[in-house]
Amino acid sequence: MRQFIISENTMQKTSFRNHQVKRFSSQRSTRRKPENQPTRVILFNKPYDVLPQFTDEAGRKTLKEFIPVQGVYAAGRLDRDSEGLLVLTNNGALQARLTQPGKRTGKIYYVQVEGIPTQDALEALRNGVTLNDGPTLPAGAELVDEPAWLWPRNPPIRERKSIPTSWLKITLYEGRNRQVRRMTAHVGFPTLRLIRYAMGDYSLDNLANGEWREVTD
């Protein structure tokens, strides 16, 4: 069990029951932690329209506006138009554990889509679909209620009044560019809102949008 450094709350491990597969994906290179420095792990609930980096020549919002911690880097990416959990660390081994192939690290997303997916669409997501960069690995996919912990998005999503929306819980074991969005579009239900809830044992539990906390690894 992990303990927060700046919060009295304790982290709850995230269950991946019914979302298990046998193959896992590749990710980017990692950074090494300088010798003799303690491992630092930052959990950040990234708002919409914030880049997952500390600098941007174009002047867009970055992590620097929220996190006054130096020497930590994101494990994987979370697109500017996506929200939710970003794990930052100075430990390359931890980055590898969260992102590299064969590490068996699932990533849970809550996804608001246009329309109500059919069982055939859900089965296609679970079994893998063929995108322009090849077939996806099997994934967890289920229809769920709107999350009780959901925060308002600014700006709100654009939705058509004549078409209902619904929420999916999707668990991936690979990290392709904009993969969730491409997968739901492929089966006919475009993504309207995308929130990453968990990476391995790390989750958004008790972490408000735009807030961060440090945890022990």
Curated annotation (Swiss-Prot):
Q: Which reaction does it catalyse?
A: uridine(2457) in 23S rRNA = pseudouridine(2457) in 23S rRNA
Q: Which cysteine pairs are joined by S-S bonds?
A: none
- EC number(s) of the enzyme? 5.4.99.20
Q: List keywords of the entry alphabetically.
A: Isomerase, rRNA processing
Q: Point to the regions of Polar residues compositional bias.
A: 19-28
Q: Which PROSITE patterns match?
A: PSI_RSU (PS01149)
Name the InterPro entries on file: PsdUridine_s_RsuA/RluB/E/F_cat, PsdUridine_synth_cat_dom_sf, PsdUridine_synth_RsuA/RluA, PsdUridine_synth_RsuA/RluB/E/F, PsdUridine_synth_RsuA/RluB_CS, RsuA_PseudoU_synthase, TruA/RsuA/RluB/E/F_N
What Pfam families does this protein's entry cite? PseudoU_synth_2 (PF00849)
The text of the family note is: Belongs to the pseudouridine synthase RsuA family.
Name it. Answer: Ribosomal large subunit pseudouridine synthase E
State the species of origin.
Answer: Escherichia coli (strain K12)
